[in-house]
């Protein structure tokens, strides 16, 4: 039944996307096609607004390559982020170049008053450039249209109705969702485009990394595993949701096979809640309530293995090799991004076959 529910939700999302596209076509015809330019003058931009009104952790982190690129191309510009991921301010507020995070509501009570308060805060500032970084977001188009901005940048497509001054055509080839916003900015500013150099970006302070290392060591000590010098620590997160989830029996077989290949490995399971049930009894386990804490702990590991979920994207911001396990979504669009990361489509593989592939990456 859970898989049936997830399948139904997937079809509903697809239906919403089709309706959103058709509505965009209607609005575009009513409003009329506008003339847009494709090239921005960096010398005219001192303030930037990025609008991504989406409550998911992964979609929020997919903005970080663009933020890094913007800061490199416009080092003196202040960047404001209009986001709706609930922990966005803590997660991204201290990034180089970012001045503030304007948080729009995602769920819960009093949505309209909270939305209007965030909108007033956004409209209190006049920006040189406002960016809608994704091609099909109705909320992004709305925020872009309501912002006080001299220039408005987004993607050009038939259903686009927002009041853009500058628009870039979608790339012909499929592009990872973490690369697409950076491509938009690089193209508009006339900068070199090297997609292989991009990665998710979440700078950590040394004290955060030290605390993460201590948390991992404490979790290992709690089960009496000990951590002899040279023993690699491999973390994993198994609690994905819906069709992305792999059952505990799958993880038990996977770890039995991987430890047979690498008996020196110390496994640590990262849990979504302190009371969550572990998938493999006897392993060290760790719950860290804040995303930056979780990221810092992952940054100290030899490898991190994750079903397609938010912690996979957090892990990909670190130097730790990250293995994403996919069975419901396209890793070409959503997989971990840096060069040492790897995505494995597991739907038609046994846990033992997946362990063999992870062993090669290890």
Positions of PLM-derived features:
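Catalytic machinery of carbohydrate-active enzymes
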Residues: 1-362
